Amino acid sequence: MSRILAIDYGKKRTGVAVTDVLQIIANGLTTVPTHQLLDFILKYVEKEPVERIIVGHPKQMNNQESENMRNIVPFVNQLRKKIPDIPVEFVDERFTSVLAHQAMLDGGLKKKDRQNKALVDEISATIILQSYLESKKYI
């Protein structure tokens, strides 16, 4: 089987997570400077089989798209053009940063470590991917 890759796209940094080859568990992979993200993904899919890419869809509480979609849509269009054989899907990412902070607290990370924004982005991508995997179990 192939992996599923997820991204939590940010203006400066983007968290990246992947599944194991059996697509059971989501694992944080890294955080990439957003301006290097496309190259990172292209290199990754050359080395590892990737079945699909999940992109966090930022929405506000009233279900309106957040401001960051203006940056995400052009990136996704570019990604689809560069690797047309790999489907790219959006998944609601509301509350992932809150859940990431809670996971860090629950994991006993010190305050200094919890302030590491790159780690928060990576954990957020992992949460997005895990929620995607769980939603597919019940379909």
UniProtKB/Swiss-Prot annotation:
It holds the Pfam family RuvX. Its EC number is 3.1.-.-. CDD domains: YqgF (cd16964). The keyword Translocase does not apply. HAMAP family: Nuclease_YqgF. InterPro entries: RNaseH-like_sf (IPR012337), YqgF (IPR005227), YqgF/RNaseH-like_dom (IPR006641), YqgF/RNaseH-like_dom_sf (IPR037027). It is found in: Cytoplasm. The keyword Ubl conjugation does not apply. GO terms for molecular function: nuclease activity. Belongs to the YqgF nuclease family. Could be a nuclease involved in processing of the 5'-end of pre-16S rRNA. Keywords: Cytoplasm, Hydrolase, Nuclease, Ribosome biogenesis. GO terms for biological process: rRNA 5'-end processing. Its main location: cytoplasm. GO terms for cellular component: cytosol. This is Putative pre-16S rRNA nuclease. Signal peptide: none annotated.
